[in-house]
From Swiss-Prot:
Tissue: Expressed by the venom duct.
GO MF annotation: an example: toxin activity
GO CC annotations on file: extracellular region
Family recorded in the similarity comment: Belongs to the O2 superfamily. Contryphan family.
PROSITE patterns for the chain: CONTRYPHAN (PS60027)
Coarse class of the protein's main subcellular location: secreted
Disulfide bonds: C2-C8
Domain of life: Eukaryota
Subcellular location: Secreted
Domain notes: The cysteine framework is C-C.
Entry keywords, A to Z: D-amino acid, Disulfide bond, Ion channel impairing toxin, Neurotoxin, Secreted, Toxin
Name the record gives this protein: Leu-contryphan-P
Chain positions found as D-leucine: L4
Organism: Conus purpurascens (Purple cone)
Length: 8
């Protein structure tokens, strides 16, 4: 999962 990218 992504942490810094809200659109991931």
């Amino acid at each position: 999962g992504c942490v810094l990218l809200p659109w991931c």
